[in-house]
Design a protein with these regions (language model features):
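Predominantly extracellular/secreted and cell-surface proteins with exposed
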Residues: 59-131
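A broad, structure-centric signal for solvent-exposed, well-ordered loop/edge residues
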Residues: 8, 61, 111, 116, ...
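Intrinsically disordered, low-complexity segments enriched in small/polar residues
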Residues: 15, 31, 87-88, 97, ...
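Terminal low-complexity, poorly structured segments
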Residues: 5-10, 15, 145, 151-153, ...
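N-terminal compositionally biased, intrinsically disordered segments and leader/signal-like regions
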Residues: 7, 17, 73-75, 137, ...
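N-terminal segment immediately downstream of the Sec signal-peptide cleavage site
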Residues: 26-83, 154-191
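Secretory targeting and sorting signals
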Residues: 1-27
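Acidic, glycine-rich flexible loop segments
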Residues: 112-159
Length: 191
């Protein structure tokens, strides 16, 4: 009997030790919500005059204001892993003169790393936008869900993002020195 207890204790210690040194996987969980990104004043007219347009990749969408002063990208949130919030679909930025485009597929908005990552045409991830500031963050809890809202995200192109867009679209209209857009994010998940 004593051998069995010792063997069981040894087995538990080995298993616990193996778990302690095993890499920790980030738990991804389903989520719902919306991410919107509206171009800052002057951005869409500057892009349009340079022959640059935006379009949505389903289920994402891009809508333009009545007088084409701004464009709003709307993407559904489908999952989260800690501070990274994954969306579905994406958007495409196109040079209308040459037809070349850069896709931002399944953008991930990370509220701790303060970046928006995209899967590009080449299959690589790139931090296309940086989140310079988040004006407000609110959380609401019900017995079954927890909802968090981030409002007034100041979005700017990263250096790598601006260089990628300028090179791929054969333009120089993309810059890191100006606010590109304002973002809002709502994420709901089960408790």
């Amino acid at each position: 009997m004593r051998r069995r207890v010792t063997a069981a204790l040894l087995l538990v210690c080995l298993a616990t030790g193996a778990l302690a040194i095993a890499p920790v996987a980030v738990a991804e969980e389903p989520a719902s919500g919306t991410f919107t990104m509206t171009t800052a004043p002057g951005i869409l007219p500057a892009w349009t005059s340079a022959g640059i347009s935006m379009s949505g990749i389903y289920p994402g969408s891009v809508t333009t204001s009545r007088f084409a002063n701004n464009a709003t990208v709307t993407l559904p949130v489908v999952a989260r892993a800690k501070t990274a919030n994954a969306t579905a679909g994406g958007f495409r930025i196109t040079n209308t003169d040459t037809g070349t485009s850069v896709r931002c597929l399944i953008p991930v908005i990370d509220t701790k790393a303060l970046v928006i990552d995209c899967l590009t045409n080449d299959g690589f991830n790139i931090a296309l936008f940086s989140i310079e500031e988040i004006q407000t963050r609110q959380s609401f809890t019900t017995p079954t869900t927890r909802t968090t809202l981030w409002r007034g995200m100041d979005l700017r192109l990263t250096t790598a993002g601006a260089q990628t867009l300028n090179r791929a679209l054969e333009t120089n209209v993309f810059s890191t020195s100006v606010r590109t857009a304002e973002g809002n994010l709502s994420v709901a998940r089960d408790r």
